């Protein structure tokens, strides 16, 4: 069996929910707060560590009630969320090889998908130890192939290997990790899924209701 390198996950929960009208992460989804779906998707031994990063006291309370590590902050930018989350994971797992950034508002994202993404980056093939550090700068994002369309749908979660950690810790104010997509296009890879709804986020009450209906069909 090949050794799996350590991968962590930052659950992004610092958004303002402006389009939703209230904190969407706490909205009911199949009988529990929507954020609990992200807890379930990341509840896997394939992840060496995980942490929720939020500006919401209520979200922090929910995390603590479910024994999910949480970091509460009051900083404004997406770059702050990335830096705080990655820094916290590196304190827990200094040898971290990859870091996944997962939004808390994609309730149909499933655990198998998270495990697949973590596994693709974290495989320690024998040759990997002999490769140059440049090959530890890969980026993996989730995607769905659209029939008769050469351009796939792409989205989150996104996983960055450790060669990019320093740049993630020093992103421009207000910017997220997507700036590295443009900087290193040859290093961006897509992990394809069969269900496009895993990419869907619940930005409005109407979108939440549609996704909940889809989830109930699978029960």
Residue ranges and their predicted role:
Residues 28, 108, 158-159, 190, ...:
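Short aromatic/basic micro-patch
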Residues 75-169:
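Conserved beta-loop-beta/alpha segment of the NTase-like Rossmann-fold superfamily
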Residues 12-14, 53, 102-103, 143-145, ...:
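Short beta-strand segments
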Residues 29, 71-73, 142, 191, ...:
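Hydrophobic residues at beta-strand termini and immediately following loops
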Residues 2-57:
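N-terminal glycine-rich phosphate-binding loop and ensuing alpha1 helix
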Residues 2-5, 9, 166, 170-219:
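Conserved alpha/beta core of the MobA/IspD/sugar-nucleotide pyrophosphorylase nucleotidyltransferase superfamily
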Residues 48-84:
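Short, surface-exposed acidic-centric catalytic microdomains
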């Amino acid at each position: 069996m090949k050794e799996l390198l350590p991968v962590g996950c930052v659950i992004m929960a610092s958004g303002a929910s402006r389009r939703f009208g209230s904190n969407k992460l706490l909205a009911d989804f199949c009988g529990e707060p929507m954020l609990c779906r992200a807890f379930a998707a990341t509840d896997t031994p394939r992840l060496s560590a995980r942490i929720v990063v939020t500006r919401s006291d209520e979200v922090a309370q929910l995390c603590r009630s479910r024994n999910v590590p949480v970091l509460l902050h009051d900083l404004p930018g997406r770059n702050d969320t990335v830096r705080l989350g990655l820094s916290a994971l590196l304190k827990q797992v200094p040898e971290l090889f990859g870091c996944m950034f997962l939004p808390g508002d994609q309730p149909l994202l499933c655990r198998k998908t998270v495990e697949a993404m973590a596994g693709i980056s974290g495989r320690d093939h024998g040759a990997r130890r002999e490769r140059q550090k440049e090959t530890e700068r890969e980026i993996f994002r989730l995607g769905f192939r659209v029939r008769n369309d050469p351009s796939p749908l792409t989205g989150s979660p996104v996983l960055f290997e450790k060669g990019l950690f320093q740049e993630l810790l020093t992103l421009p104010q207000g910017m997220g990790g997507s700036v590295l997509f443009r900087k290193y296009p040859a290093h961006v890879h897509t992990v394809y899924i069969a269900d496009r709804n895993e990419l869907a986020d619940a930005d409005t009450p109407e979108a939440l209701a549609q996704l909940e209906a889809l989830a109930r069909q699978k029960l």
